[in-house]
Regions:
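The canonical Cys-X-X-Cys-His
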Residues: 37-44, 97
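Axial heme c-ligation environment in periplasmic c-type cytochrome domains
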Residues: 51, 69-95, 101-104
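Flanking scaffold residues of small Cys/His-coordinated metal-binding clusters
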Residues: 33
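Gly/Gly-Pro-rich "capping" loops immediately C-terminal to redox-active cysteine motifs
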Residues: 42-71
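Bacterial N-terminal signal peptides that target proteins for export
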Residues: 2-15
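N-terminal signal peptide c-region/cleavage motif recognized by signal peptidases
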Residues: 22-24
């Protein structure tokens, strides 16, 4: 339980730092958006996040459909805070980022 609480606290801290350090949204440029937000956790699969490019890890999530994936980002899931680390992203941005992360790199 302590580990989970610490992980969530660390994620919230990272989310706040990302908003201060990288407030710019890179609309239409998923790799740049990813580097400024999602990559903090998804680059290596921190706290249960499926790693970018790991198609097998993303497969069960993608079976739920893109709308469900976007809702998970918007509302938060597990250690991921609502909005991920891109609170200024639109649903279309989230969908592009999910597509980018869930495909082989």
């Amino acid at each position: 339980m302590i580990t989970i609480a610490f992980t969530r606290a660390a994620m919230r801290l990272a989310a706040g730092a990302a908003l201060v350090v990288a407030p710019t949204v890179f609309a239409g440029d998923p790799p740049a958006q990813y580097a400024a937000s999602c990559g903090a956790c998804h680059s290596v699969g921190v706290a249960g996040a499926p790693a970018t490019g790991n198609v097998a890890a993303w497969a069960p999530r993608m079976k739920k459909g893109m709308d469900a994936q976007v809702a998970s980002v918007r509302n938060g899931l597990g250690a991921m805070p609502p909005g991920g680390l891109c609170n200024s992203c639109s649903d279309e941005d989230y969908a592009a980022l999910i597509t980018y992360m869930s495909t082989a790199q």
